[in-house]
Amino acid sequence: MTSLTSHASHWAKQLGLGVAFYRLYHQPRQFVQRWRRVGLSHLADLAHDQRQMERAAAALPPLAPRSGPPLEVYYLSGRKFWYQTVFCFYSLALQTDLNVQLVVVDDGTLSHRYQNLIRQVCPTVRFVLATEIETRLNAVLPWERYPTLRSRREAYPNLRKLTDIHAGTTGWKLVLDSDMLFFRPPTALLDWLKNPQTPCHMVDVETSYGYSPALMERLAGVPIPEQINVGITGLQSDALDWDELEHWCRTQIEQAGSHYYQEQGLIAMLMARHDCCVMPPEDYIVMPGPAEVISPQAQLHHYVAESKPGYFRHGWKHIVNGYSDPT
């Protein structure tokens, strides 16, 4: 099966069918995997919980304008994730008096409808739309020079958290995954946001890079730290070497095929060359268990894998109900 999949991926890539292959193969496969994990009836419950969360996001009271230096927080988002983005940023804003500002980078599906839904809750939001992104990428990452990065971002939207947010821009940027919620002030994260000096990241429950340490270390030229999670990622945009990233991305695919965790692996390779600011693992929980989901003790939850049902069933409701610190 693995061999068949890799051959199919190869020919889809050669024929320029990256997006179509992703939709026709990977998305149905993801559905089957989820069905096997939680059962078909529970998938229906999950879909109901997601719709309930989406309606709740649209009904959140608007965030009031704040004073002080603006501190931008970036998300890649669109039609499928806008409400998760709103809840994540909203929960962060509730935990600080700093002038945090939402920046939503269009994943290609951020129509006027979803822009308006986000803006009614986060009135000061700034959108970076697909037309602007495409123009910028054509200027700084032209297809003829960066064919792998450009084609890969079409088939693999996660890569846009690198290309679309950072290419052709300057300065430090904090990028958060949308499937996270804050329950207490994230002191270390806010300290970094106020004065970024080195890249930052959070710690995963396991190492998930998609490629062998040997290949990654050979490409990066340094040992690769384990368990980097890109739910929290702070990078300096103008410090990224896009020729190098093109080489890394192309070589990984040529030698080991494409992988869902490639973006996390590439960022881990970038982080490996720096003395990074690692968010303290005791402050947050990646993939919280049922008890923690129902009664949060950590500052932050990152709801990956098996914790998704709890996120949609319980997590966001803590924000709506005005979660209070049990301590």
Region roles according to the model:
Residues 1-61:
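Membrane-proximal basic amphipathic "stem/tether" segments
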Residues 157, 161-207:
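GT-A fold catalytic core of metal-dependent nucleotide-sugar glycosyltransferases
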Residues 101-108, 202-203:
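Short internal beta-strands
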Residues 295-327:
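Long, low-complexity C-terminal extensions of enzymes
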Residues 115, 119-168:
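Active-site-proximal specificity loops/subdomain of glycosyltransferases
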Residues 70-75, 92, 101-104:
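Hydrophobic targeting segments
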Residues 79-96:
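Histidine-anchored nucleotide/phosphate-binding helix
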Residues 205-207, 223-306:
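Catalytic core and acceptor-binding pocket of nucleotide-sugar-dependent glycosyltransferases
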